Amino acid sequence: MMLPRLLLLVVASALPLASVAAGAVGVGEGFCSAEPSAASGGCSGVRPPLYWKATNPTLAPAHLQDLPGFTRSVYKRDHALITPESHVFSPLPDWINTLGAYLISPAIGAHFTMYLAKMHDGSKSALPPKGVERLIFVLQGSILLSEESGNTHTLLVDSYAYLPANMKHSVISDEVTTLVIFERRYTTIEGYHPDLIVGSTDKQPLLETPGEVFELRKLLPTSLPYDFNIHIMDFQPGEYLNVKEVHYNQHGLLLLEGQGIYRLGDSWYPVQSGDTIWMAPFVPQWYAALGKTKTRYLLYKDVNRDPLI
């Protein structure tokens, strides 16, 4: 008679533990294998912010703390892969309450700079050097862009602004905000002058890509006043570039969503959201999208100027 009572006590005492375990599954990842993508929301059904993995990558620096000395970053003569665990943030010159990490600069042979700016409550930008144009793209948070004329623009995630060289402006933010910024010394053509442009990716039309399968948007006009452009390129899983590109243009790339394999020269790199790539002129380059979600990357490209200039 004692055995049934003992079993009953064991089962009863285990019930609270089972409830706790079930609760843990409910609040954690549990058995859900779905990624919380912008489309599905994962198990919780709550959609994460756009480009959340660009600022919170799968292999974030915190995940690599138990691998001292390990990095996926690579620097070679004609290309570089800069991954998040290698980012070094420090105060940006003349900016207020803002940290920056320079990812690409003339020190590696580029004719432009590409950097991340992390703004916080009460932060404010500084102007670029004289003769330098700037493009700002919002990855996280929001900013208020003010022109010298007094006009203002609110930029949310996936919005951007192109500021011509020597145009006075300021950017402020009162929340945690991450920007990717491109700057280069403007190459003038007599009689042509670029204009201020404020826009968002989703407002840009899809462009024809003969012979290719990816979707392409361009953030700036293709006309002569503009000496560079920013391409937004989307690949579905399994899609890849048909052309194995070799050209005189330089590239600065930030992977906003997804993962895949990037060929640079004779090297093949697994890449994911948050990774940055520098491509020098004439380095062979090719990309294939892998995984379960689409790839989207942002790509700097110099255009509309004779390479001899």
From Swiss-Prot:
Keywords: Endoplasmic reticulum, Hydrolase, Manganese, Metal-binding, Purine metabolism, Signal
Top-rank taxon: Eukaryota
Signal sequence segment: 1-22
Gene Ontology cellular component list: endoplasmic reticulum
Disulfide bonds: none
Subcellular compartments: Endoplasmic reticulum
Known catalytic reactions: (S)-2-ureidoglycine + H2O = (S)-ureidoglycolate + NH4(+)
Signal recorded as keyword: yes
Gene3D superfamilies for the chain: Jelly Rolls (2.60.120.10)
Family according to the record: Belongs to the UGHY family.
This protein's name: Probable (S)-ureidoglycine aminohydrolase
The species this protein was found in: Oryza sativa subsp. japonica (Rice)
The encoding gene: UGLYAH
